[in-house]
Amino acid sequence: MRASVDLSRLRAFLEELARAAREPTRLYLTGGASQLLRGLRESTLDIDLTFEPESDELLRSMVSLKEWQSVNVEIVSPVHFVPALPGWRDRCEFVMQIGKLAVLHFDPYTQALSKLERGHVRDMQDVQALVGERIVDPVRLRTLFAEARSELFRYPAIDPKSLSTAVDRLVGVDKA
């Protein structure tokens, strides 16, 4: 079992990973790691991330870093689970530059939709924190979701009605 990740461990991981970046790279943090950097959590079990462009050097470095620091690292993005919401790239928030590595929060609206779809207690707490800090506006999330709804066929595991209900509940409109 690997130890949970606090802010100092996350920063140390990112700084070491940046040493392997040989070209300008955008690293998108999502899930608990994003919440941790926002100050909305004190720890996370995993460092969930994705990067562009993909790099063999960074992938190799991540494997050795996760063993050396005894952390869980997952290459994952909310768009693996829900459709990318329109304009998602424009809503990714720059966090820091470490050498050639630009660290960003993945679009908080797509993150929130992914967490609503999963529906775990911790996910719902994360969504409430994003709303409470005014990072995500529930009405805007519903609008963006409506625009992306036609892409749900690409995600057979999603129950469109349940996801719509979860979004409506967040807005305060219970259609159940």
Positions of PLM-derived features:
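Compositionally biased terminal segments of proteins
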Residues: 1-176
